[in-house]
């Protein structure tokens, strides 16, 4: 309740259960599609740890994801490569470095990794080598997103293992429910068709457009036109 007041938010019962799971477990996975409140949970747990003067480290696999994490939480986030002081030149170098990498323990009471679906097995191994005993690890991501470019499907495999406490957030919150991008992402994932123009409401954002083309060539030209 105190954290809710501090950051002026309201937590659903499922989000409160997620906070409890993080407090009760050393490793927790938070998964869910866009607009389901993952960021709200992250902001709340950060506030709780800040109140207790505990050290929290935020990170993500790419620069863009780290920047977005900083913007949404108000706390500094870094890329995993920067946090772990590693670099990738090519896959052969990465494999060689993987055998030699010892890592330096990360000084943190809580480590939160966002966009875990983008993390491959090499990067995950580096991270695990650098975690102090007793440090809590929160892994956040959408298991329905495409897996990492590198080897492995870390997030989905960890969930399927059943060895790690996993909370699946599935409620789309009011603000997110106004976005047709988010609504249609969930509909496609459920095997449903896109919302049509006729199904728009006064509250629905015009942020999703369906463009019909008559052939593959026309479709490719349209994509090129939109991107240039």
Where are the language model's segments positioned?
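Pre-Walker A (Motif I) flank of P-loop NTPase domains
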Residues: 14, 23-30
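P-loop (Walker A) phosphate-binding loop of NTP-binding proteins
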Residues: 22, 33, 61
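Conserved helicase motor core of P-loop NTPases
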Residues: 18-21, 144-228
């Amino acid at each position: 309740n105190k954290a809710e007041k501090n950051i002026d938010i309201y937590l659903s019962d499922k989000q409160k259960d997620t906070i409890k799971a993080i407090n009760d477990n050393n490793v927790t996975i938070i998964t869910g599609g866009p607009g389901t409140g993952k960021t709200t949970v992250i902001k709340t747990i950060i506030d709780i740890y800040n109140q207790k003067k505990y050290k929290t480290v935020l990170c993500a696999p790419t620069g863009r994801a780290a920047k977005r994490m900083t913007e949404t939480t108000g706390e500094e986030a870094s890329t995993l490569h920067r946090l772990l002081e590693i670099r990738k030149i090519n896959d052969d170098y990465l494999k060689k470095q993987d055998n030699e990498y010892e890592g330096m323990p990360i000084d943190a009471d809580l480590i939160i990794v966002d966009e875990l679906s983008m993390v491959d097995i090499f990067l995950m191994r580096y991270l695990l080598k650098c975690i102090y005993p007793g440090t809590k690890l929160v892994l956040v991501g959408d298991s329905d997103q495409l897996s990492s470019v590198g080897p492995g499907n870390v997030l989905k495999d960890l969930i399927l293992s059943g060895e790690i406490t996993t909370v699946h957030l599935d409620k789309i919150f009011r603000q997110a429910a106004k976005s047709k991008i988010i609504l249609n992402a969930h509909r496609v994932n459920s095997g449903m068709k896109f919302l049509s123009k006729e199904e728009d409401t006064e509250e629905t954002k015009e942020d999703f457009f369906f463009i019909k083309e008559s052939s593959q060539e026309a479709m490719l030209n349209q994509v090129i036109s939109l991107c240039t």
